[in-house]
């Protein structure tokens, strides 16, 4: 089992003046601690509720993850997950290719249909109806495959037309950076995972009660994914199974043994890669504890 880290907020003490140094410290610590992956969100407004108000500090995802890639050497990097309709697919694939080249082959393409209408409308970005967002997502996945195999013939879809999809340089990671699709809709999202993706990302929860409730749901979603793979002739084991969860590793909150047990339970239902976000990530100590007491133990889980 591998452990990843997602950074979800930027309202730390001293923000925004110290955001650059704090983010660099988080990234280098995670890299040295043995985290397998490092992610930021693709949001332009904060998400509300426990995450903070819409006008809380929020950094653009690809600028931020490129900054963090430049300060690390081993950890894989990505955006969890890209809102597909926020960028034209040709530009998105060029962006991820550039990230992969500059990071030495460490990029993921994390992607989803997009859901946060307020930020899209607020900044004047397109936000079509749900069915169209999924149709556009599928075309983007096709374009990614098209460009990353070096096919320069035109791509003509219902929504996107690329007359000369040159992509040079190609990513260092061959045949391409891994494509990770976020979401767990059984009819559309998981079918797209089976057809196009190298990884799925499911959401577990943020509390012990949500973890207990989420485990059987995760197991069910993976069963549905297996069924889609069988229908499409895809080898299920080729797909990296990841989950996203929130933990607060600190006195009075979750402890090391609880997180280790959570990882063990996730491994038992077929999860290979757990991506955690932590409200106290800027304090650094929790990352060091992960590196010393959690990552070495869960590495043996399969």
Each language-model region and where it sits:
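N-terminal beta1-alpha1-beta2 module of alpha/beta enzyme domains
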Residues: 1-71, 177, 212, 277, ...
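Flexible, glycine-rich active-site loops centered on histidine and acidic residues
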Residues: 2-21, 82-154, 203-204, 210
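Hydrophobic faces of well-ordered beta-strands that scaffold small-molecule active sites
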Residues: 3-7, 38-40, 76-79, 107-111, ...
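An alpha-helical appendage that flanks or caps ligand/catalytic pockets
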Residues: 7, 31, 36, 131-173, ...
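Active-site mouth loops of central-metabolism enzymes
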Residues: 7-21, 80-90, 131, 174-185, ...
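Short, acidic/polar
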Residues: 17-30, 92-95, 183-195, 253-266
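Acidic (Asp/Glu)-rich catalytic clusters
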Residues: 31-32, 65-74, 96, 100-106, ...
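Short glycine/proline- and charge-enriched loop/turn segments
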Residues: 45-51, 119-128, 173-175
């Amino acid at each position: 089992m591998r452990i990843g880290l997602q950074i979800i907020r930027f309202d730390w003490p001293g923000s925004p003046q110290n955001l650059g140094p704090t983010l660099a410290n988080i990234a280098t610590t995670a890299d040295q601690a043995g985290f397998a992956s490092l992610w930021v969100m693709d949001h332009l407004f904060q998400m509300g509720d426990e995450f903070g108000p819409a006008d809380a500090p929020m950094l653009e995802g690809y600028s931020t993850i490129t900054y963090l890639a430049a300060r690390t050497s081993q950890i894989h990097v990505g955006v969890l997950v890209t809102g597909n309709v926020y960028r034209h697919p040709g530009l998105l694939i060029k962006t991820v290719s550039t990230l992969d080249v500059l990071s030495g082959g460490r990029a993921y393409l994390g992607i989803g249909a997009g859901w946060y209408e307020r930020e899209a409308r607020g900044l004047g970005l397109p936000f079509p109806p749900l069915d169209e967002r999924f149709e556009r997502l599928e075309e983007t996945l096709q374009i990614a495959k098209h460009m990353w195999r070096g096919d320069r013939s035109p791509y003509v879809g219902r929504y996107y037309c690329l007359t000369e999809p040159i992509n040079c340089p190609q990513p260092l990671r061959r045949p391409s950076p891994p494509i990770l699709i976020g979401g767990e809709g059984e009819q559309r999202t998981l079918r797209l995972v089976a057809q196009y993706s190298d990884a799925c990302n499911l959401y577990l929860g943020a509390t012990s009660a949500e973890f207990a409730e989420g485990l059987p749901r995760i197991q069910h979603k993976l069963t549905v994914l297996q069924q889609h793979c069988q229908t499409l002739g895809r080898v299920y084991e080729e797909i990296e199974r990841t989950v996203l969860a929130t933990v607060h590793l600190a006195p009075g909150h979750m402890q090391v043994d609880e997180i280790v047990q959570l990882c063990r339970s996730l491994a038992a239902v077929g999860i290979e890669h757990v991506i955690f976000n932590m409200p106290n990530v800027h304090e650094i100590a929790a990352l060091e504890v992960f590196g010393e007491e959690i990552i070495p133990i869960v590495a043996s889980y399969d």
